[in-house]
Amino acid sequence: MDRQEMFQGKRWGLFNHFLCVPAGDGTGEPCSPEEWNARVDAFDVELLAAQLREVGADYFCITIGQNSGHYCSPNPVYDQLVGISPSKCSRRDLIADLAAALEPQGIDLWVYLPSGAPCADAQAVERLEWVDGQGQRLASFQRKWEAVIREWSLRWGERVKGWWIDGCYYPDAMYNFPDEPNFKSFAAAIRAGNPQALVAFNRGLEDPFLPQCPWEDYTAGEVGDWLPIPGQKVREQLQGKKLHVLSYLGQTWGQGQPRFPDELVAGYTKLILAQDGILTWDIPLEPNGAIPQAYRRQLQALGRMLEE
């Protein structure tokens, strides 16, 4: 099957930064493994699945982890590589539980993961041989990170439909090589458990709609606090990839109250859909995984307006 067929019937989805510190925080005080496990255990996947169905989301994307070194799924390969005990990977496999709750609702599950080691965890950075913010080859790190990703991909199999990989800021230094590790081997690790998994590699805000390599399926599309209107130039550079836009409904990633009026949210969503694109809105969640009421109301309005 052509992976582009996986986008059929998909219009918009939601994203959540499920983390122990605010999104993007590389220095904040992390929680203990027990505190992290308590947070993961408190997530009611059935409640969220029902609310996602109610508001009409076609897919849901959640962070496996980011900078602190806490991940919401077990990974023995990661634990062996970094040697941290007790593990900062959760005992509960939240990703597997989410997938099981979403599938009966007809909602796909995507996952987010950085392309680098957790920068706020010094031991993980050292053991994985990661150098943050440098345009280096880092071949040894890449091999280790591919092994970590492969373990998760095989664990979840076809239940995870898409991946959004953050922080691919140095493609020419790290990935654009004919010999492995490269984008091809990176994508192969991601698709080890599901050859049809959709993949995007995020190069940052500078050119969010420029595909990085042949092994991507959609644009990373991170646009932050601005809402661009993709024009003819963007359509010409897609190279057969799906146009995708990622922004947040709150004040920033995963925080604050809704910043837009309902009409703007619906209008911009319609604009992207009219260009055969898809749009992902980031929102915060309550500690139990529920959509906060202000966002739930706005998303219900979005669903109604899209049907008008």
Regions flagged by a language model, labelled:
Residues M1-E308:
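Mature catalytic domains of secreted/periplasmic carbohydrate-active enzymes
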